[in-house]
Amino acid sequence: MENIDNAAAESAAAGYFRIALGVEYKGSRYRGWQRQEDGVPSVQQTLETALSKVAASPVSLHCAGRTDAGVHASGQVVHFDTRAVRSAKAWVMGANSHLPHDVSVTWAQEMPAHFHARFKACARRYRYVIYNDQIRPAHLGDQVTWNHRPLDIERMAEAAAYLVGTHDFSAFRAGQCQAKSPIKQIHHLRVTRHGKMIVLDIRASAFLHHMVRNIAGVLMTIGAGERPVAWAK
């Protein structure tokens, strides 16, 4: 954190402003948040291109949490440093005028130099929605996971309780995960049914690559009766 604070002080001394933005996006067309070297579309690159036009200079973004390919966001927070003097409204309206229909900036605010979207985040929250019916949905395909097997919500909720707290989530991370430690703390994991929809609401200090979708996969397997509840341990 000391290096980050020093960098923030240097940026402020050089006449830079730190701007935070609220962002929402539909991730279906993107290879996740992170900028891709091979030119494959990413949310980060799309936003940086739009903001650079508003700032009339290159913009480099830092986010609260990197989302995987196909993942949507409704409350992503990002920040960047710039010498460009713009009002909050100008950042929002200007960025949105250069963004595609599936990415939107919802608010902007100048922040103190020590603010950091990633390291000042208190927690990250995901909502994973399962469409549980024999017939696949026609209009929700890229916003839900379809599971045709009858899922027992009580078994899923019981299994979810094992995951709350601080644990080693190595079994739930992707092989290419770059996180230094598999130890993460889940603050809240609730499983509820709303008709054909089963919603997993999960809040944690941070997540590993593919951690949420792997948790969902384990809970669905248990809910289908293919594994015992204790398999989630």
Language model features with spans:
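Structured-RNA-binding interfaces characteristic of tRNA pseudouridine synthases
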Residues: 1-233
